[in-house]
A protein has these predicted regions:
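Short acidic/polar hinge/loop motifs at secondary-structure boundaries
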Residues: 130-158
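Face-selective signature of the C-terminal outer-membrane beta-barrel domain
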Residues: 251-266, 310, 314-319, 330-477, ...
Length: 725
């Protein structure tokens, strides 16, 4: 029996056994988990019933509460009622996820510690399409975001998902699922405006072509207003983003469906390169310690370079850096980004209950990081087959195979400040064209072939065991096997205990593996020349290997209260850390957990919250670049049937933003967001929100050694107006 049939039977049972949910406790035979699921099902449109399960870590769809994993589900109301603009903002309400803002257009997301400020060590998919940028190992959250009207859910699976999802699903998986075109019929509009001029507008139109085929298209425009850095100077982070997309769904037969979809995104902003400590003067004859040339000048050291002759293209200083007072020198350049993709999917169910899907993806991504003179175009083609089948009432098998081809066209140039004669030891000559990043003749074409199998068995009515492995052969990593095992034990109809082990791998980014980095230039006072300093690419970098151990307990004391506890320990070998003078690898251990609750105190009051703790050790030393403790609390109170008072509180522990020369401490902070949401009609929603109300501003994050300092995350007031279908 598939999940749609199970949901329909559950609704039929409810209608026959009770008149309404006020008598839910009289539902004989339903556990508190099932009662809570029933309440949610009755609130859904009938067309959405087939899309309520979670894809899970077992390779087939099961109800959320049966998953032997730490899972958090974000739905559209979790975005709109909490005053979030983008999907990534809603991750702040997920225990264990650390979401920060740099300047106005930069969002950073870390899951369960140890991924650095920019590099993502969890896997993100949008309708099955991996969105990790392989060049730098990052995700552009603006480019990958989607209109709220087409969002069905975001499944946040904390913990390694190696045996199903494979490489890069190290600390977890974010699985974004959009709605079927049949569920987006008509017109939808969403407008958001902040008091500082930041704006977002979305339009979605859906229609029906025939009895069995549906379509939609959508448009989005986003404007960024200019903010300030923590020193008070302009952040130069204004700009814009534009997006468009479409989807076509057709029912080819009673058990055969076809989907064709695509999208385009463009963004135009500026980004900075910190030059404050890039020209160095040696303090000893062996060139082992240095100070910036600007400091050497103020100290009156001998044989200094002449700015007008030896580095005439270098920008002038504009004040001082913070907190270390070094003369501030920076260079802003354009950072255009364009991306487009197409997706086709054929799916069905055979007569012997084999549920299968065949998906194809094509993607073109073009970006220029003008501030470091690095640009690339990526073409990618993917083919993915997945299937699952119940072998018996107590035995379920999932399996799949996939292939990928990627090609890159990389171009590196010297940016304007660096165009002055410098000795390059790798060529033995003076050059004026040394780029910051040099991909050189490194490989530009990569193939990957993968397969997985997952076997889930009900050993008893209470115990479920699932074991599987992902097999991969790729040009980036060679051949790997990523095994995993999960079990769940139902004490009774209110308590589920689960555990898991996974061996997960993360591939180094192409910058880490293949790119030479010229990070500074040193003045040689004896010879009167600049000498380029660099660290070579690390083509011999191995994949990061992580053994993940997890335990969890899920308790639903009633249909109104869900409590979850998740504990984990990660043991990572060859974790990649970059910085002068080399790319280095370290052993990292991370231990932590999350405690969450979801409580419907009454028909008018809904509370959600969570606390997370995570402590990491790098080569035995405690890491300080990640907050050990974080907490969030969300409250939605219906003042009237159509008026909701929203309150969100977030606590984040202190941390230090690492840097090669200028570490920046970030104090712990408490954030309060308040909002009123009015729903004058069923499909209209008007919200007014105040965010970060406790402080006028605070810093959160920045790109290490690229940004000079973090931007201010300021108190903002937001007006949102939306009309649903």
């Amino acid at each position: 029996m598939n999940l749609l049939q199970k949901n329909l039977w559950l609704l039929l049972f409810a209608s026959l056994s009770a008149g309404n949910l006020a008598h839910a406790d009289e539902y004989t035979g339903l556990s508190p988990f099932e009662k809570a699921e029933l309440e949610r099902l009755l609130e859904l449109d009938f067309r959405d019933l087939g899309r309520v399960p979670i894809r899970s870590v077992l390779g087939y769809e099961i109800e959320y509460w049966r998953n032997p994993a730490s899972v958090h589900v974000i739905r559209p109301d979790d975005v709109s009622l909490n005053g979030h603009v983008l999907m990534v903002d809603s991750f702040r309400n997920v225990a264990g996820m650390y979401v920060t803002r740099g300047v106005g257009y930069d969002d950073f997301v870390t899951m369960r510690n140890f991924s650095g400020s920019a590099t993502e060590k969890f896997l993100t998919l949008v309708d099955g399409r991996e969105v990790l940028q392989r060049m730098g190992g990052t995700i552009n959250w603006t480019t990958e975001d989607i209109p709220l009207a087409i969002l069905d859910r975001v499944e946040v699976i904390r913990g390694a998902g190696a045996s199903i999802w494979g490489t890069n699903a190290v600390s977890g998986v974010v699985n974004v699922v959009t709605k079927h075109a049949a569920s987006t019929q008509g017109n939808s509009v969403r407008l958001l405006a902040e008091h500082d001029g930041t704006f977002l507008g979305e339009y979605v139109h859906g229609g029906q072509i025939s009895e069995d085929s549906y379509y939609r298209f959508w448009l989005r425009a986003q404007e960024y207003s200019e903010g300030e850095l923590i020193s008070g100077i302009p952040a130069r982070d204004d700009g814009f983003a534009r997006k468009a997309g479409f989807r076509y769904d057709k029912i080819l037969g009673s058990d055969l469906d076809f989907t064709f979809a695509g999208g385009f995104a463009t963004r135009r902003v500026e980004h900075v390169m910190d030059l404050s400590s890039r020209l160095l003067y040696p303090l000893d004859a062996n060139f082992t310690s240095f100070v910036p040339v600007s400091i050497a000048t103020s100290l009156g050291l001998p044989n200094l370079p002449d700015p007008a002759v030896d580095y005439p293209s270098w920008p002038s200083s504009i004040g001082f850096t913070f907190p270390t007072p070094i003369p501030r020198i920076d260079n802003y350049e354009d950072m255009p980004q364009d991306g487009s993709h197409l997706r086709a999917k054929l799916s069905g169910v055979t007569d012997n209950d084999l549920e299968w899907s065949l998906s194809g993806y094509a993607e073109l991504y073009d970006t220029t990081l003008g501030h470091i003179g690095h640009s690339w175009e990526r073409k990618e083609f993917d083919l993915d087959f997945k299937a699952n089948r119940p072998i018996s009432d107590s035995h379920h098998l999932a399996f799949g195979i996939a292939a990928r081809h990627m090609s890159f066209d990389v171009n590196d140039v010297a940016t304007d400040p660096w165009i002055f004669p410098t000795f390059d030891s790798s060529t033995g000559s003076l050059r004026t064209d040394i780029p910051i990043l040099d991909y050189g003749d490194s490989p530009t074409k990569f193939d990957r072939f993968t397969g997985f199998i997952q076997d889930s068995i009900d050993l008893t009515d209470q115990v479920v065991l699932s074991m599987g492995a992902k097999f991969e052969d790729s040009d980036l990593s060679g051949s790997t096997v990523q095994p995993g095992a999960r079990f769940s034990y139902s004490f009774d109809d209110r308590n589920i205990f689960w555990g898991a082990y996974s061996r997960a791998y993360r591939q180094p980014s192409l910058v880490e593996k293949y790119t030479k980095v010229s990070y500074a230039r040193v003045w040689d006072p004896s010879n009167g020349i600049w000498v380029n300093t660099f660290f070579e690419s690390a083509s011999d970098l191995n994949d990061e290997r992580m053994d993940a151990y997890e335990l969890g307990w899920r308790m639903r004391t009633s249909a109104d209260l869900l409590i979850e506890l998740s504990l984990y320990h990660y043991d990572t070998k060859d974790a990649v850390f970059s910085g002068p003078p080399i790319y280095s690898t370290s052993d990292v251990e991370t231990t932590g957990g999350e405690l969450t609750f979801d409580y419907r105190a009454s028909d008018t009051w809904h509370l959600k919250g969570g606390y997370s703790f995570s402590r990491g050790k790098k080569d035995g030393e405690i890491q300080v670049d990640f907050p050990e403790s974080m907490a969030n609390l969300s409250s939605h109170l219906k003042i009237r049937d159509n008026l909701i008072f929203s309150k969100n509180i977030y606590y984040t522990d202190d941390r230090i933003i690492p840097s090669a020369y200028n570490e920046i401490p970030i104090d712990d902070y408490l954030r309060l967001d308040l909002g009123l949401v009015w729903r004058p009609k069923d499909n209209w929603e008007i919200g007014l929100f105040g965010r970060d109300l406790l402080d006028p501003d605070h810093p959160e994050n920045m790109y290490n050694d690229l940004d000079v300092e973090p931007g201010k995350v300021e108190r903002t007031f937001l007006l949102s107006i939306s009309k649903d279908f």
